[in-house]
Amino acid sequence: MPITSKYTDEQVEKILAEVALVLEKHAASPELTLMIAGNIATNVLNQRVAASQRKLIAEKFAQALMSSLETPKTH
């Protein structure tokens, strides 16, 4: 079942494009990009989510990340 979002694809894509431009400007490697993304997620959880909800939301975030990864097709 697809997950519905309260945010439009346009909103998400616009912000994603702006972030991508900043990372490109700084020639951020994939490793640095993932480190930055992880730090952003950690900061959001620690600063904007109630302590009682952090673990649950982090687990849901991790599950969503894992489910969004493309798996290589085997023949």
Curated annotation (Swiss-Prot):
SUPFAM superfamilies: YejL-like (SSF158651). InterPro entries: UPF0352, YejL_sf. It comes from the Bacteria. Signal peptide: none annotated. Gene3D superfamilies: YejL-like. It holds the Pfam family DUF1414. Belongs to the UPF0352 family. This is UPF0352 protein VP2129. It comes from Vibrio parahaemolyticus serotype O3:K6 (strain RIMD 2210633).
